């Protein structure tokens, strides 16, 4: 067996709880039990060492005595991570390098954040020797050139209804009611007259030109507050004839224990194909959904993606692909349609909104062109703690160089370099740890 394993740490702490009565003591013990019983390791600090933090789970207790509102016990904690941690510290890079000191007693995993100022086909971090991590690849300047894979052709925020026209049709129902904007998204002002079908407002807007290879990102909220609430938020893709050629939807119709269902489908003249139709990895996972629904078509290959976004971080993602060998679903994209809907007389989901819709044209590269993987304004995070690389909150480990590693920084002096040297500004965050 190679490598080494550091055993878990056990901590025992004697406690005294003093109350004015036995009744008050019972309530205090209830509160303490609620605090101690957690599903994950939580921060643990002691009054004589407030600048250090353990991460622990409750592991039982030995009771002492109880008399007249006084109670003693020994509480045991299990730290599967045996180290104790200092407060995080952040150090900015000076131009393209940073020198910092790890004052702990063991190595640490860094988190490096780069705010990109110019496009690049790669981004690399390392110590100038064997330690490095990288996304993308550097071009051969003698015979290669960078190019932008995506060109934005349509970007509509949910803060302005200008330019939208009333749509003609929706799936399984009728266009009724109207939209309003709350400054952050399009929401239903009304759903129209009650019927047995789906109903609700729908608007459409044309793209500047027909787009064959495209990517669309739709940012949507569908948050169910009770299991008897139903509804849907949908974005349709239309061809030049106004026909629906694809749909991105988050909906709740009561199935799978009243789960929100993410759906991305493509359509031809006589049929359709669901690339994604799921509640996620478990029922009700997306019932508080705010996130992105994405569809990309390059040639005859479709890639669909759904992810919740929580505090700027993409999580609980689901993806799927489909190749249209028969050419059934290849009409050029001409317009976008948005819709939120209510089903019959059912109680509707009150928190439903379409916040933003972005459409990109996917550019066809020449043989000697290498795509830029970051653009000005992007934020890239090399998170060596969680073994992840994020671009604007979205995991992009698919871009990671095969030889790159989530390296650690030993105790003492460390220097890191960033390439390209003019890529932007950066900072490193570490949390020193001690045995």
Give short role names for the model-derived ranges:
Residues 38-83, 87-89:
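Short beta-strand and beta-hairpin "edge-sheet" elements
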Residues 89-435:
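Intrinsically disordered, low-complexity segments enriched in serine, threonine, and glycine
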Residues 21-23, 52, 64, 83-85, ...:
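Residue-level signal for secondary-structure boundary sites
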Residues 2-7, 64-68, 103, 207-209:
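Short, solvent-exposed beta-strand/turn "edge" segments of beta-rich domains on protein surfaces
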Residues 25-26, 44:
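Short N-terminal amphipathic alpha-helices
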Residues 1-23, 69-82, 414:
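Oligomerization/assembly interface segments of phage tail-like spikes and tubes
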Residues 27-36:
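Short amphipathic alpha-helices in soluble, non-transmembrane regions
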């Amino acid at each position: 067996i190679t490598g080494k394993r550091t055993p878990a740490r056990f901590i025992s702490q004697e406690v005294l709880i003093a109350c004015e009565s036995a009744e008050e003591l019972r309530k205090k013990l209830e509160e303490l039990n609620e605090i101690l019983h957690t599903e994950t390791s939580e921060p643990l600090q002691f009054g004589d060492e407030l600048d250090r933090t353990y991460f622990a789970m409750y592991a039982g207790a030995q009771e002492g005595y109880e008399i007249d509102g006084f109670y003693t016990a020994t509480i045991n904690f299990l730290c599967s991570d045996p180290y104790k941690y200092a407060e995080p510290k952040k150090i900015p890079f000076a131009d393209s390098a940073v020198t910092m000191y790890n004052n702990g007693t063991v190595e640490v995993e860094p988190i490096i954040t780069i705010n990109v100022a110019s496009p690049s086909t790669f981004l690399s971090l390392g110590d100038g020797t064997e330690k490095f991590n990288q996304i993308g690849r550097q071009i051969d300047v003698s015979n290669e050139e960078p190019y932008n894979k995506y060109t934005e052709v349509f970007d509509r925020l949910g803060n302005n209804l200008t330019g939208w026209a009333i749509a003609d049709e929706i799936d399984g129902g009728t266009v009724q009611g109207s939209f309003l904007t709350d400054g952050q998204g399009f929401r239903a002002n009304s759903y129209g007259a009650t019927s047995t079908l789906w109903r609700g407002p729908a608007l459409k807007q044309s793209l500047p030109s027909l787009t064959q290879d495209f990517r669309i990102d739709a940012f949507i909220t569908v948050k169910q507050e009770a299991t008897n609430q139903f509804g849907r938020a949908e974005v349709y893709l239309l061809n030049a004839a106004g026909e629906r050629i694809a749909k991105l939807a988050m909906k709740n119709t009561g199935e799978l224990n009243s789960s929100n269902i993410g759906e991305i489908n493509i359509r031809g003249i006589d049929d359709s194909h669901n690339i994604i139709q799921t509640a996620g990895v478990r029922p009700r996972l997306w019932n508080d959904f705010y996130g992105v629904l994405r569809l990309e078509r390059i040639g005859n290959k479709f890639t669909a993606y759904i992810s919740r976004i929580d505090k700027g971080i993409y999580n609980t993602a689901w993806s799927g692909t489909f190749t249209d060998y028969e050419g059934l679903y290849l009409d050029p994209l001409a317009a976008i349609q948005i819709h939120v809907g209510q089903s019959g007389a059912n109680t509707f989901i009150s928190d439903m909104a379409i916040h933003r819709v972005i459409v990109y044209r996917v550019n066809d590269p020449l043989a000697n062109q290498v795509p830029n993987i970051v653009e000005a304004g992007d934020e890239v995070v090399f998170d060596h703690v969680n073994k992840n690389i994020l671009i604007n909150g979205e995991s992009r480990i698919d871009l990671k160089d095969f030889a790159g590693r989530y390296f650690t920084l030993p105790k003492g002096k460390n220097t890191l370099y960033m390439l390209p040297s003019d890529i932007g500004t950066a900072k490193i965050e570490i949390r020193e740890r001690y045995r």
